[in-house]
Amino acid sequence: MVCREQLSKNQVKWVFAGITCVSVVVIAAIVLAITLRRPGCELEACSPDADMLDYLLSLGQISRRDALEVTWYHAANSKKAMTAALNSNITVLEADVNVEGLGTANETGVPIMAHPPTIYSDNTLEQWLDAVLGSSQKGIKLDFKNIKAVGPSLDLLRQLTEEGKVRRPIWINADILKGPNMLISTEVNATQFLALVQEKYPKATLSPGWTTFYMSTSPNRTYTQAMVEKMHELVGGVPQRVTFPVRSSMVRAAWPHFSWLLSQSERYSLTLWQAASDPMSVEDLLYVRDNTAVHQVYYDIFEPLLSQFKQLALNATRKPMYYTGGSLIPLLQLPGDDGLNVEWLVPDVQGSGKTATMTLPDTEGMILLNTGLEGTVAENPVPIVHTPSGNILTLESCLQQLATHPGHWGIHLQIAEPAALRPSLALLARLSSLGLLHWPVWVGAKISHGSFSVPGHVAGRELLTAVAEVFPHVTVAPGWPEEVLGSGYREQLLTDMLELCQGLWQPVSFQMQAMLLGHSTAGAIGRLLASSPRATVTVEHNPAGGDYASVRTALLAARAVDRTRVYYRLPQGYHKDLLAHVGRN
């Protein structure tokens, strides 16, 4: 009996001991979770390679994924500046990293917080990170001015990250390419910089830029296509998010190149920055804002311009200014949205001659203008628009009337006769130079080239040459002549079209007939889309070719290839039927 009582007491002790151990483990786990997961911050958003917007949104420091809500503190280098930055309501700290005593006998190799030519500081990078990581939740952007500072700094970041102390996005910046107006090379070595990041601290956001110079008393050049393409060549293959710092005073003139750059990868964004002495136009900032998704561009701009820009940018009644060579995003299609939501509309015309007026459907979308020519090339030709009613309106009058209509529009010029191509492009160029063309513009035609050479159609080379020479800021929309499509879109037809369009920097939307997709080479749409990040496909159908039921399967198959990059140029009734079918399923 005594033995049993003793055994029972021992069991009770072990039970209590077990409960105590489990409780300690649970409490430790909770404490660890709270430590790693600061209030409001989602774990994925708190990693060094996280999206800055996701991080700030998790903390409640911004209200939506809009990069305009992010605020910046410049040159938080000295302890005094760092303390002021930490006590501010700024969301991201920007600081410069150099090497102590760089280029002197006193060079130590220690990373310090200083902007060249300063090579000494009361703040080392280690001290700076200790203060910022320990007392704030602010995002971090480190600007490296010399390659010698990069390796030791990344080693320190890696150590702190492994210790669990870096729970926020880290941006690693360096100017790695020679940019506008630079007479000498002062950039950080691109190859070494990128290699060090991949080797020592790959879980970060890259911020590679161009060295620039601006002088108000002399002519200033802007970023060139070659500069932008070289940058993409350098970083296109890296796995990180990439945000390109761009001098805001130079961005508008180079927008065709940056529009191209942003379209090359969903990992890309821009950070517009302003030097204190730079003249800056709020209209230029609004132009960039209008032509990008709100998460694609950060604005590191000084006051009072920043507040003025924000007020105008968020004004829903302001009339936006769209780049004619841009995509339909965000004007007619939200990022990631279904291309089926973009509708093609055909205007009608009442009257004739100078008194003719144009009417549009109530909905918004792409305005299809079948364009021909009045008169001969030798007689001062006038581009005209053919309408379903048979009435004719000049293209210039049509575009000017459209400019007065409220709403969101894109323009799709379908060149019906070869002689109308260059006069139509010349008109677009003139209206654009006058500031009267504020929508995305597509210029398309059924073209003759290679295995689909057919007399009477616009020559494929001529379409591309005319666009390049007369008005390059458009989306090119080539299609195949019906005469060669008896067996559908065969392999050689696809190959010749892709070879023709290879290397274009403009967006391309290949025009395909729905009735023929079922008879075509397997994967035809996918192959066209794979040719470029900017490539799209527009599936069209004429009611004379059959009712909706006859093309429904082909339309749904096209949509299954890519919901976001396939558009549908259909009669309004067919478009509604397709929307209804997709909605039911």
Curated annotation (Swiss-Prot):
Membrane topology type: Single-pass membrane protein
Cellular component per GO, a single term: extracellular space
Pfam family, one: Menorin
InterPro entries: Memorin
Localisation: Membrane
Record bears the keyword Lyase: no
Keyword Transcription regulation listed: no
Keywords annotated in UniProt: Membrane, Transmembrane, Transmembrane helix
Transmembrane regions: 14-34
Similarity field: Belongs to the menorin family.
Entry protein name: Protein FAM151A
Species: Homo sapiens (Human)
Gene name linked to the record: FAM151A
